[in-house]
Amino acid sequence: MIQASTHVVCSPLIAEVYALLFAAKISCRLQLQQGSFLTDNLPLAKMAASRDINNTIISWRCRQPISEFFQISHSLNVVYHISRNTNGIAHNCAHQVLNSRVEPVFSCSRSSHANVPCPFLQSLLNFQVQGYVIHAVHCL
């Protein structure tokens, strides 16, 4: 689980778009071969599924980050819509990040990483993406 924030958002939709983009960048950094992205925003999920940047369902402000998401996630292109109730954990985590301004927390509780450095934490320890701040990384 990764908690991060960005200051380039002006609406919940834009926040969701930038969250998808950041997830794609993390997936690339971790060199994931497969992946799925979850969103509770149905129009965004439909646009991502169609991979149509000119889809009028979504605000024009989303087109640049969505375009970048498409470029980065071409092999990880599965975006699923989930209900807002199902997405409660992500919603709560987002509010935790907004309410806390502490140093980043990196932790691993995987038993398979007990005797070796966690490869996920090692990969993300110095990972920086312009416009984003990582607040927590928990390898579960």
Region roles according to the model:
Residues 1-140:
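Primary recognition of RNase H-like, Mg2+-dependent phosphodiesterase/nuclease domains
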